[in-house]
C-alpha cells in the first residue's frame, strides 16, 4: 500500500501566515523582513508537516488554487437580496481583505513565487481555472478504484468531505471541544473495516492493518506525542450528501452563495435564511431525519426534493415564492457547491487529465524527498521585491423544478 499526503495549498499558505500573527506577533507582509519571514515560514511548514506525517506516507501532492471556473458562471441574484449586495462568487471576501492590515497583494505574489519554486522539488498541481478543492476531488476520483493507493488530505474545509472514499480520508486541522487536536474524516466503510470487523474476519485474520490506522489516528501535528481520538471525538464519518444538500439549500457565506429562501423580520432590521434546523423541521413533517442516507435519497429523487422545498416554503413562512425561482437558484448552488467532475468545464478537465498523465509515474513510483527543502531559497521573479468521480453523483441535470 502506497500512501500519499495531498495538501490544500491555499489553506496551507493561510495557515502559515496565521502562524506569524499568533499572540502578540504581527506580520502584515509590508516590510522586507516580514516578506522574508513569510517565505521562510512556508518552507518550514512543509518540513514540519512532512515530519508529522513521515511515518505514515510515501509521497506528497500539493494542490493550489489558480483562478476558478466558478467565476465564469453567471451569478444568481436571489429575489430577497438588495441591489447593493455583492453577488459574485467569493466577492464578499474582497472588502474584508481590503480592510485588513495584511497586504494581500503581497501575500498572493509571495505565495505564487513559493509555488513556482517548489514545482522543481515535488508534485504540484497548479491549473488555471481550477481551485484546490477541484484538484483534490479529481485526483481522488482518478485513484478511486486503486486498492494500492491511499490518500490523506490535509485541509480544514468541511466541503472536502465530498472527496472521502474507502481509499481517501481527510485530516482536518481544526480545533474544537471534541477535536482539540484536529480530526480525521473517514468513510463509513473504512470505519467498519478498522473498528467493526465481523467474526469471520477476526477469526481468519483481516487484510487491513488496523494497527497502522490506530497509530495514524493518534498522531499529533506538533511533536512526537500521541493524542487520543475516538469516533465523534477526533474521528468523524464523512457525510458528503448531507454537506451538499445543506450548503446548496442554506447557502455558503464564505463563498457568497445564498440561501434559496430569505426573508426580513417584521421590523425589517434583521435578515433570515434557511438553517439546518428549518430543514430538520421540514423533514420531521414527513417523518424523516436529517441523516446522510435521507440526504442522498433527496438529492437523487426529484419528487422527494420537490416535496422538501414545498415544505420548507411553509416552515419558513414563504408560501408565495414560485418553485421555478427556487429551482433555478438551487441548480446554481449545486453547480457551485458539488465537487463533481461533471460540473467542471471540459477545457479544464482536459488540462487536468494532461497534467495528471505527466505526473502519474511519479505519483506511483517516487518517494518524497524532504532534503531538497532544507536551506531552500524561493526564486523571486520581481526584482523590486526580490525576497524571498466520483465523490457524489452529478445531480444538477435532474433538479428541474420548472
Model-derived regions, located:
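Noncatalytic, basic helical substrate-engagement surface that gates or grips nucleic-acid strands
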Residues: 2-150, 160, 164-186, 338-339, ...
Amino acid at each position: 500500500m502506497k500512501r500519499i499526503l495531498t495538501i490544500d495549498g491555499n489553506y496551507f499558505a493561510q495557515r502559515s501566515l496565521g502562524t506569524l500573527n499568533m499572540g502578540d506577533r504581527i506580520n502584515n507582509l509590508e516590510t522586507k523582513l516580514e516578506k522574508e519571514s513569510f517565505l521562510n515560514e512556508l518552507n518550514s511548514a512543509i518540513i514540519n508537516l512532512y515530519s508529522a506525517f513521515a511515518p505514515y506516507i510515501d509521497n506528497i501532492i500539493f494542490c493550489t488554487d489558480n483562478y476558478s471556473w466558478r467565476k465564469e458562471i453567471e451569478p444568481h441574484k436571489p429575489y430577497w437580496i438588495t441591489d447593493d449586495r455583492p453577488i459574485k462568487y467569493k466577492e464578499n471576501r474582497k472588502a474584508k481583505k481590503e480592510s485588513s492590515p495584511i497586504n494581500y497583494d503581497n501575500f498572493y505574489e509571495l505565495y505564487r513565487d513559493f509555488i513556482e519554486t517548489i514545482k522543481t522539488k515535488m508534485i504540484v498541481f497548479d491549473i488555471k481555472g481550477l481551485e484546490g478543492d477541484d484538484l483534490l476531488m479529481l485526483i481522488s476520483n482518478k485513484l478511486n478504484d486503486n486498492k494500492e493507493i491511499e490518500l490523506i488530505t490535509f485541509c480544514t474545509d468541511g466541503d472536502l468531505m465530498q472527496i472521502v472514499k474507502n481509499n481517501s480520508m481527510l485530516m482536518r486541522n481544526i480545533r474544537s471541544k471534541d477535536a482539540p487536536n484536529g480530526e480525521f474524516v473517514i468513510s463509513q466503510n473504512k470505519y467498519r473495516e478498522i473498528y467493526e470487523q465481523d467474526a469471520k474476519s477476526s477469526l481468519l485474520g483481516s487484510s487491513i492493518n488496523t494497527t497502522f490506522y490506530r497509530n495514524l489516528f493518534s498522531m499529533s501535528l506538533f511533536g512526537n506525542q500521541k493524542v487520543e481520538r475516538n469516533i465523534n471525538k477526533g474521528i468523524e464519518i464523512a457525510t458528503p450528501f448531507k454537506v451538499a444538500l445543506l450548503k446548496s439549500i442554506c447557502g455558503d457565506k464564505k463563498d457568497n452563495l445564498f440561501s434559496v429562501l430569505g426573508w426580513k423580520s417584521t421590523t425589517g432590521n434583521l435578515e433570515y435564511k434557511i438553517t439546518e434546523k428549518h430543514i430538520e423541521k421540514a423533514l420531521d413533517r414527513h417523518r424523516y431525519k436529517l441523516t446522510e442516507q435521507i440526504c442522498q435519497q433527496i438529492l437523487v429523487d426529484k419528487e422527494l426534493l420537490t416535496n422538501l422545498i414545498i415544505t420548507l416554503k411553509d416552515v419558513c413562512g414563504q408560501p408565495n415564492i414560485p418553485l421555478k425561482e427556487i429551482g433555478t437558484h438551487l441548480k446554481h448552488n449545486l453547480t457551485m457547491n458539488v465537487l463533481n467532475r461533471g460540473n467542471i468545464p471540459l477545457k479544464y478537465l482536459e488540462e487536468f487529465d494532461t497534467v495528471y498523465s505527466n505526473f502519474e509515474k511519479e505519483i506511483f513510483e517516487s518517494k518524497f524527498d524532504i532534503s531538497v527543502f532544507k536551506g531552500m531559497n524561493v526564486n523571486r521573479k520581481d526584482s523590486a521585491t526580490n525576497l524571498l468521480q466520483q465523490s457524489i453523483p452529478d445531480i444538477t441535470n435532474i433538479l428541474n423544478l420548472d
